Each structure stands twice: as structure tokens, then as C-alpha cells.
């Protein structure tokens, strides 16, 4: 009794496989022949499997003859119902094999679409039937199959997976070649413009994907794609390469490159859609790479040649298409960037050369020409090249090159001509005139100026000229707009930092302080003896304004009183300060009483001093005027030239050509009593030519001096931090530190090093060639 209980402790009955198999087999046959099945019949089949799996068998019957029993963890052989299933599993496997062997006979002689229709239809039916069978065998899967797999037995699968493995071995492998070839032929037909039944391909692909079972894990989720990759994708990619190699070569021989690019673009989109419609998504990247290699990379040289043609012809749409294609190739854009940089550089040089000498003295023409080139190619980079950083850099390099070195800089024999012309253009925008644009337009134009400013190498030159011109605008009160002036200084500060604009901002402050000072002086005059003329003053801090001290000058007695009253007033407010008068920048108004009409003359202080002499006499020699005004002869001659040209004064020979007459000490100059002018207010305060030239020379001289100081300061800063440095390293660091202001010339840096050695800031290291050390 005890023996019986150990073999069948719960009194379960023993069911032999033969007892259920005929009915189970008939039911499975019904499933695979797609006959309708009632739910009750399905449950009968399920119950057959369940009853068999839960019946009691001897362990050797459970496993089947010749199969060694599995060992439990304790080395014991578990017996009983746990292991019932192997015989059923083997019968199911045999059934599937026989079913597919018979099915293969119907398809093995088919080709092309016929084999695809056969394969996809049978696959769909088989897949569905196998899922039904998997449900019928659910208990077998959960218990016997799961336990076998857990114990590491190979070649045992969940029933649905077993069905797939059997399909793979018995139907897929024999038909694989003709099915894959049929799929590839169908794809080629579609590439050639024919309409195809894409469901045939997607059906095959779906089958290939699902057949990629994970052999190591019968219950693994998702396929491994091995079958799909090896049996289809590798051949598909090779086919793709052959097809497009032939097509691209033939198309390029018969059509322009622009048409080829459209074709390539269309083909790439087609292949992308192909994956979406009927291939596996994992093929996307491989297929794209293959197409890009064949359609683009192999023809890069042709693209490079065409790129230049498209630039020359301004074919922006085609350039954009080329960019989109070539950007798909790794490092493919390098050559296009170089070609673009060279092209923009050449276009910039040609545009400036076309302006000729006119641009040398016409800042507006020069800057506008530069901006036109930049605007054109900036728009190209944004629209055609997607504002790609590499193409933006090519634009920047090209603009930097042609702006700092072109026909105008060569004519001027100075690379500093560009910043000077840009500063003069700013002056023309910010100076009061009848042509001043509206505020919004002016702001937009100043933004455009900053575009050019970005590319200027010698920013210190721009700053010097800009400061000179700003100073004159402020002193002569002819700024178009204080807001625009402040806006421009703010833009420069943003671009170059506080130090770059500190003097410009100080100038503004001085003008504000001077307004308050004038109010205080007027108030002071009302409380004491008033002046008998209008008088205003600007007090400028000497370190911030780019003006030189005044030359010798004897103030006319008519102006002496104003001068003395203000000097005394200022001294009472600021006892420690000394005023230095800039007569060359001062101006005033004179009213005439000696001509037919009464005129108001707007004149410089020097002009006033000369004209006031004629209150006493009608004629003076040049020497007499020099003695009475104390103005140096070279400056006096220029002032007299302007007065002679305005016809207020005349030479003794009234018909003589003023430009051709050399003024000598004994030259007699008379007041012209027949003076006439259509205007009653006449501005005779025009700049002197030699004064402008001298100013320009002084500015350039100051720039060179300032540069030397900046270079020396940079060297000291670097050496203080590094202590010891090789010559080449020092040069490199100086160039890096100062490149945002200007490009220092190497000979000047060397000279500055020598100066600092003399001043004992540095010394040469003994025994080491070209090495310097810092002296604390």
C-alpha cells in the first residue's frame, strides 16, 4: 500500500497519450485547416492536454525512452505528474513537421509573385492556427515546458515558438531563396515606377522578423532579427547599392547636376518611406547610409565643382539642396565651407575694387558696399545652409579678410583705413543734417555698423577716430540725437567692454556737467554786474577728450571781460583746478554794421579775432594781423584763406585768384565793403584742410604710441603670471590677449620686450636661448 501511495498519493488516474491523441490530433488538424470550431470543442481539446499533463506516470514514461532524468537541486529525480509532457510535445512537433512538409509541396515550384502570395497567405494562416494551438497547450507550456527550460534543457520551446521553429526549418529554409528573390524583384519594380502589392513584401518581412527566435530563452520577449538580417536585409542592401550605382552614373551622364540633386533627394525620401511602409524599422539607418554613400559620397567631386557654379549664378535653392544632401556625409561639408569662404572673399574684394578711388573718401559708399556683400551671403548662409555654424564661420573669416585688406586699404597704404572709414560713416549718421534718418531707421543702421565693426581687426583705430568725431559733435552741439549717441556707445561697450568706451562715456558726463555750470554762471551774473553779450562755456576733463592744447592766441578785448569773469567764477568753485582754454574749438557770432545788409556771421574765435580788427581800419598787412592776434603764421594763413574765399576780405588786387596767391607778411588784406549774401545768417566756420590732415596724422601717431603701451602692459601682465617664458610662447600670448583690440606686429612686440628689459621689468635667462624671466 505504501508503495502505491508514493507513486499516486492523491489517487489521480493514469491517462495514456494514445487514449487522447486521436481526438486531439483531429482537433489540431481542424485548427490548421482553418475549419470553424465551437468553444465547447476548443475546451475539449484543452481538457485533453490538461488531463494528460496532470495524470500520473512512471518517470521514465513521463520523459520518454532514452531521455536521462533531470536532477533536482538535491540530486534527486523528481517523479510524478510534474514531468508529464514530453511524449505529447514530441507528437505535436511531429504533427507540425508533417503538416509543413506536405504544405511545402504546393509551394516549392512557385516563383516571383506566386511564391510570395503562397508564402504570405500560408504564413498568416499558420501563425493564427499556431496561436490557437498555443492556447490549447497552455497548461503544457506553463508547467512541463517552463520546468524543462528552467532546468536548462535545450531545444524545448513554448508551443507557439515550436511552431515557428518548425516553420523555419521545414518551410522557410527550403523556400527562402526564391521568396527573398521575389521580394527584391518586386522592390526593383517599384523603384522603376511600377505599382506593386506592398502587402506581399510586408507579410514576408513580418514573417522573417518573427522567425528570429531567441534560442537561448524560449520565453524571451521579442525576436532577435537574426533571420531578417541574414536572409533578407544583407541581400536587400547589396541590391540597393547595385541599383543606385547604375542609376546615378547613367543619370549624371545625361542630366545636369541640379537635376541629379532633385533625383537623389526624391530617392532618399522614397527609401525612407519604403522602410515605413513594408520593411523593419531597424533597416532605416543602414539603408540611409548605403543610399547616401552611393548617391552622394561617390559623387562628391562633381558636387564640389557644381557648388562653385551655383555660387557664381546665385542659385540659392540649389545650394540649399546640395547642402542638405552633402550634410548627410560625415565630414562632407569641409570642402564646401572652404569654397564658400574663398567665394565671399573674392566677391568682397571685387565689390570694393569696383568702387575705385571714390570709396577712399566716401565712407557711406565704402561701408554700404561691405554691408551689401555681407547681407547677401548672410542671407544665403541662413536660408540655404541652415545657419550651420561651419558656414557662419566661413562667412566671418571671408568678411574679416576682405574688410581688413582690400583695394581701398592698399590705396591708402594702411590696413587702418577700414576702421577710419567706418568711424567717419558713424559720424555722418550721428551728426545733425537735413538727411538724418528717423530714429528707428537710425538704430537699424547703427546695428548694421556693428556688423562691420565685428570684423574690424584694428578696433583701437576705430575708437580713436570715433572719439575724435564724437568730441567734435558734442563740443559743436551738432549731434542728431543724444539717444542715438548713447545707444551707439552702449553697443560698443557690449562688443568690447567697459574700458573701450570709458572715455566716450566721460565725454557725455562732461557735457551734462557743463550745462549745469552754465546755469550756475548765468545765475551768478544776475546777482552781480551782467555781461553785455551771450556767453556759454564747456569745461572738459583733460584726460578724456582727444584735444590738444591751444596754440598762441591773443583774445580780442571785446571777449576779454567774459573770459575773466568766468575764470574768477570757476576758481571760486574749484580752487585747485586750472583751466586751459581751447581757442581753436571756440566759436561765436558777429553782427555786421558795415555792409548794405545787416548779417550775422557764425565764426570761429580766430575768425572773430581777425574780423574785429577791421572795426578800427579797413586794411591790414598779414604781419599786422599776426602781431595783433598772436596766431601762428601757418594757421593764420588758413584762416585768412577762408575769409578771402567768403569775400568778406579781399586782396589788394581784388581780381587775383585766392588759391594761387601766397600770403606774405607784407600782403595787404582789406575789408570788402561790397559784400553780399542771399542769407542773413552766414556760417563761415568751416574746417581747415591742413588742420584735418594734421589731425589725421596726429591720430595715427597717437594710435602707434598707445599700442606700444598696451603691448608693454600685456607683456608685463603675462610675465608676472608666468614668471619664465620662451620667446615664441610670449609672442603667442600677447597676440591672443590683444587680438580683440588690434593685431600687433611681431617687430613691435620685440621692440617692446627690449624696452621692458631696459626698464628692468624682464631679463634674458642666462644659458637659455630666447627665454625671459620676470623681475619683481
Swiss-Prot record:
SMART domains assigned to the protein according to its UniProt record, in alphabetical order: CULLIN, Cullin_Nedd8
GO MF entries: protein-macromolecule adaptor activity; ubiquitin ligase complex scaffold activity; ubiquitin protein ligase binding
Pfam families: Cullin, Cullin_Nedd8
Pathway membership: Protein modification; protein ubiquitination
Gene Ontology CC annotations of this record: cullin-RING ubiquitin ligase complex; cytoplasm; cytosol; nucleoplasm; nucleus; Parkin-FBXW7-Cul1 ubiquitin ligase complex; plasma membrane; SCF ubiquitin ligase complex
Subunit structure: Component of multiple Cul1-RING E3 ubiquitin-protein ligase complexes commonly known as SCF (SKP1-CUL1-F-box) complexes, consisting of CUL1, SKP1, RBX1 and a variable F-box domain-containing protein as substrate-specific subunit. Component of the SCF(FBXW11) complex containing FBXW11. Component of the SCF(SKP2) complex containing SKP2, in which it interacts directly with SKP1, SKP2 and RBX1. Component of the SCF(FBXW2) complex containing FBXW2. Component of the SCF(FBXO32) complex containing FBXO32. Component of the probable SCF(FBXO7) complex containing FBXO7. (Microbial infection) Interacts with Epstein-Barr virus BPLF1.
Name this protein carries in UniProt: Cullin-1
Organism name: Homo sapiens (Human)
Amino acid at each position: 500500500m505504501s508503495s502505491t501511495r508514493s507513486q499516486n498519493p492523491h489517487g489521480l488516474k493514469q491517462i495514456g497519450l494514445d487514449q487522447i491523441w486521436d481526438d486531439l490530433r483531429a482537433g489540431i488538424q481542424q485548427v490548421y485547416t482553418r475549419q470553424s470550431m465551437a468553444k465547447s470543442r476548443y475546451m475539449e481539446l484543452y481538457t485533453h492536454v490538461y488531463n494528460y499533463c496532470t495524470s500520473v506516470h512512471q518517470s521514465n514514461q513521463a520523459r520518454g525512452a532514452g531521455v536521462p532524468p533531470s536532477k533536482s537541486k538535491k540530486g534527486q529525480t523528481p517523479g510524478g505528474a510534474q514531468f508529464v509532457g514530453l511524449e505529447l510535445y514530441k507528437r505535436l512537433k511531429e504533427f507540425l513537421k508533417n503538416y509543413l512538409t506536405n504544405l511545402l509541396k504546393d509551394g516549392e515550384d512557385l516563383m516571383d509573385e506566386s511564391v510570395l502570395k503562397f508564402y504570405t497567405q500560408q504564413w498568416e494562416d499558420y501563425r493564427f492556427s499556431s496561436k490557437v494551438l498555443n492556447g490549447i497547450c497552455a497548461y503544457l507550456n506553463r508547467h512541463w515546458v517552463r520546468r524543462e527550460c528552467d532546468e536548462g534543457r535545450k531545444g524545448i520551446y513554448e508551443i507557439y515558438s515550436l511552431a515557428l521553429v518548425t516553420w523555419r526549418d521545414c518551410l522557410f529554409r527550403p523556400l527562402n531563396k526564391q521568396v527573398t528573390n521575389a521580394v527584391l524583384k518586386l522592390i526593383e519594380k517599384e523603384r522603376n515606377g511600377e505599382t506593386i502589392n506592398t502587402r506581399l513584401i510586408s507579410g514576408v518581412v513580418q514573417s522573417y522578423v518573427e522567425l528570429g527566435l531567441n534560442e537561448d530563452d524560449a520565453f524571451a520577449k521579442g525576436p532577435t532579427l537574426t533571420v531578417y538580417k541574414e536572409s533578407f536585409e544583407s541581400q536587400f542592401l547589396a541590391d540597393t547599392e547595385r541599383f543606385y550605382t547604375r542609376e546615378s552614373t547613367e543619370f549624371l551622364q545625361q542630366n545636369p547636376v541640379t537635376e541629379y540633386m532633385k533625383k537623389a533627394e526624391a530617392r532618399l525620401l522614397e527609401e525612407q518611406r519604403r522602410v515605413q511602409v513594408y520593411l523593419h524599422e531597424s533597416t532605416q539607418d543602414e539603408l540611409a547610409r548605403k543610399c547616401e554613400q552611393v548617391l552622394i559620397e561617390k559623387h562628391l567631386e562633381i558636387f564640389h565643382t557644381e557648388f562653385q557654379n551655383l555660387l557664381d549664378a546665385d542659385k540659392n535653392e540649389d545650394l540649399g539642396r546640395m547642402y542638405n544632401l552633402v550634410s548627410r556625409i560625415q565630414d562632407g561639408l569641409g570642402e564646401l565651407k572652404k569654397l564658400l569662404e574663398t567665394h565671399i572673399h573674392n566677391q568682397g574684394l571685387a565689390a570694393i575694387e569696383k568702387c575705385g578711388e571714390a570709396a577712399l573718401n566716401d565712407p557711406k559708399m565704402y561701408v554700404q558696399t561691405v554691408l551689401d556683400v555681407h547681407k547677401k551671403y548672410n542671407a544665403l548662409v541662413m536660408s540655404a545652409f541652415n545657419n550651420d555654424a561651419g558656414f557662419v564661420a566661413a562667412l566671418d573669416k571671408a568678411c574679416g579678410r576682405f574688410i581688413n585688406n582690400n583695394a581701398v586699404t592698399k590705396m591708402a597704404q594702411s590696413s587702418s583705413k577700414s576702421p577710419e572709414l567706418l568711424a567717419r560713416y558713424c559720424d555722418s549718421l550721428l551728426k545733425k543734417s537735413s538727411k538724418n534718418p528717423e530714429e528707428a531707421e537710425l538704430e537699424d543702421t547703427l546695428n548694421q555698423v556693428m556688423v562691420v565693426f565685428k570684423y574690424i581687426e584694428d578696433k583701437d583705430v576705430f575708437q580713436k577716430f570715433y572719439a575724435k568725431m564724437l568730441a567734435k559733435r558734442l563740443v559743436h552741439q551738432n549731434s542728431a540725437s543724444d539717444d542715438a549717441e548713447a545707444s551707439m556707445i552702449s553697443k560698443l561697450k557690449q562688443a568690447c567692454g567697459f574700458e573701450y568706451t570709458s572715455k566716450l562715456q566721460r565725454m557725455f558726463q562732461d557735457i551734462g556737467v557743463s550745462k549745469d555750470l552754465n546755469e550756475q554762471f548765468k545765475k551768478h551774473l544776475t546777482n552781480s554786474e551782467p555781461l553785455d553779450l551771450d556767453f556759454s562755456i564747456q569745461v572738459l576733463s583733460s584726460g578724456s577728450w582727444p584735444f590738444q592744447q591751444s596754440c598762441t592766441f591773443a583774445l580780442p578785448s571785446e571777449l576779454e571781460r567774459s573770459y575773466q569773469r568766468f575764470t574768477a567764477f570757476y576758481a571760486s568753485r574749484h580752487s585747485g583746478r586750472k583751466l586751459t582754454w581751447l581757442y581753436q574749438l571756440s566759436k561765436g557770432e558777429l553782427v555786421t554794421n558795415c555792409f548794405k545788409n545787416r548779417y550775422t556771421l557764425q565764426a570761429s574765435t580766430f575768425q572773430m579775432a581777425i574780423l574785429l580788427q577791421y572795426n578800427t581800419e579797413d586794411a591790414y598787412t598779414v604781419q599786422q594781423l599776426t602781431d595783433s592776434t598772436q596766431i601762428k603764421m601757418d594757421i593764420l594763413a588758413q584762416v585768412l584763406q577762408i575769409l578771402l574765399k567768403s569775400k568778406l576780405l579781399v586782396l589788394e588786387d581784388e581780381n587775383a585768384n585766392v588759391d594761387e596767391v601766397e600770403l606774405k607778411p607784407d600782403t595787404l588784406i582789406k575789408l570788402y565793403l561790397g559784400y553780399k549774401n542771399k542769407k542773413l545768417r552766414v556760417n563761415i566756420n568751416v574746417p581747415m584742410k591742413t588742420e584735418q590732415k594734421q589731425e589725421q596724422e596726429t591720430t595715427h601717431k597717437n594710435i602707434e604710441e598707445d599700442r606700444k603701451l598696451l603691448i608693454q602692459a600685456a607683456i608685463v601682465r603675462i610675465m608676472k603670471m608666468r614668471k619664465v617664458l620662451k620667446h615664441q610662447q610670449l609672442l603667442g600670448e600677447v597676440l591672443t590677449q590683444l587680438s580683440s583690440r588690434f593685431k600687433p606686429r611681431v617687430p613691435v612686440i620685440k621692440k617692446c620686450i627690449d624696452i621692458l628689459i631696459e626698464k628692468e621689468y624682464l631679463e634674458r635667462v642666462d644659458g637659455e636661448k630666447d627665454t625671459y624671466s620676470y623681475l619683481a
